Protein backbone atom coordinates (compact mmCIF):
# COMPACT_ATOMS: atom_id res chain seq x y z
CA UNK A 1 0.00 0.00 0.00
CA UNK A 2 1.73 3.16 -1.16
CA UNK A 3 0.58 5.30 1.75
CA UNK A 4 2.43 3.20 4.34
CA UNK A 5 5.51 5.13 5.42
CA UNK A 6 6.71 2.64 8.02
CA UNK A 7 5.86 -0.05 10.52
CA UNK A 8 5.95 0.10 14.30
CA UNK A 9 7.48 -3.15 15.52
CA UNK A 10 8.21 -3.97 19.15
CA UNK A 11 8.84 -7.11 21.19
CA UNK A 12 5.13 -7.53 21.89
CA UNK A 13 3.77 -7.57 18.34
CA UNK A 14 6.76 -9.50 16.96
CA UNK A 15 6.28 -12.20 19.62
CA UNK A 16 2.54 -12.30 18.95
CA UNK A 17 2.80 -12.85 15.20
CA UNK A 18 5.66 -15.34 15.67
CA UNK A 19 3.24 -17.55 17.63
CA UNK A 20 1.33 -17.76 14.33
CA UNK A 21 4.57 -18.58 12.45
CA UNK A 22 4.59 -15.18 10.71
CA UNK A 23 7.57 -12.82 10.47
CA UNK A 24 7.54 -9.01 10.29
CA UNK A 25 9.09 -9.25 6.81
CA UNK A 26 6.20 -11.39 5.58
CA UNK A 27 3.64 -8.90 6.91
CA UNK A 28 5.45 -6.01 5.23
CA UNK A 29 5.54 -7.93 1.93
CA UNK A 30 1.84 -8.80 2.12
CA UNK A 31 0.88 -5.19 2.82
CA UNK A 32 3.26 -3.78 0.19
CA UNK A 33 1.41 -5.59 -2.58
CA UNK A 34 -2.24 -5.01 -3.34
CA UNK A 35 -4.06 -6.27 -0.23
CA UNK A 36 -7.80 -6.22 0.30
CA UNK A 37 -8.34 -3.91 3.28
CA UNK A 38 -11.54 -3.64 5.31
CA UNK A 39 -12.31 -1.28 8.15
CA UNK A 40 -12.81 -3.16 11.39
CA UNK A 41 -14.00 -2.00 14.79
CA UNK A 42 -12.23 0.36 17.17
CA UNK A 43 -10.05 1.94 14.47
CA UNK A 44 -8.64 -1.37 13.31
CA UNK A 45 -8.07 -2.43 9.74
CA UNK A 46 -8.25 -6.00 8.41
CA UNK A 47 -5.95 -6.79 5.50
CA UNK A 48 -5.85 -9.85 3.27
CA UNK A 49 -2.66 -10.04 1.24
CA UNK A 50 0.03 -12.25 -0.23
CA UNK A 51 3.77 -12.40 0.34
CA UNK A 52 6.30 -12.50 -2.49
CA UNK A 53 6.60 -16.26 -1.95
CA UNK A 54 2.82 -16.64 -2.33
CA UNK A 55 1.82 -17.10 1.31
CA UNK A 56 -1.65 -15.69 2.04
CA UNK A 57 -1.79 -13.63 5.24
CA UNK A 58 -4.57 -12.03 7.28
CA UNK A 59 -3.31 -8.99 9.20
CA UNK A 60 -4.97 -6.69 11.72
CA UNK A 61 -3.37 -3.28 12.23
CA UNK A 62 -4.02 0.25 13.42
CA UNK A 63 -2.94 3.41 11.61
CA UNK A 64 -0.67 5.86 13.41
CA UNK A 65 0.26 9.45 12.56
CA UNK A 66 2.68 9.98 9.72
CA UNK A 67 1.52 7.01 7.66
CA UNK A 68 2.97 4.41 10.02
CA UNK A 69 1.07 1.32 11.07
CA UNK A 70 1.26 -0.93 14.11
CA UNK A 71 0.46 -4.56 13.44
CA UNK A 72 -1.70 -6.13 16.14
CA UNK A 73 -1.75 -9.66 14.75
CA UNK A 74 -1.10 -11.64 11.59
CA UNK A 75 -1.73 -15.25 10.63
CA UNK A 76 -2.12 -17.51 7.62
CA UNK A 77 -5.49 -17.12 5.91
CA UNK A 78 -8.01 -19.91 6.32
CA UNK A 79 -9.07 -21.82 3.21
CA UNK A 80 -12.35 -19.86 3.16
CA UNK A 81 -10.48 -16.54 3.38
CA UNK A 82 -8.13 -17.60 0.56
CA UNK A 83 -11.11 -18.49 -1.62
CA UNK A 84 -12.74 -15.10 -1.02
CA UNK A 85 -9.43 -13.26 -1.53
CA UNK A 86 -8.85 -14.89 -4.91
CA UNK A 87 -12.26 -13.71 -6.17
Per-range role (PLM):
Residues 1-87:
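Ribonuclease/tRNase effector modules and their secretory precursors
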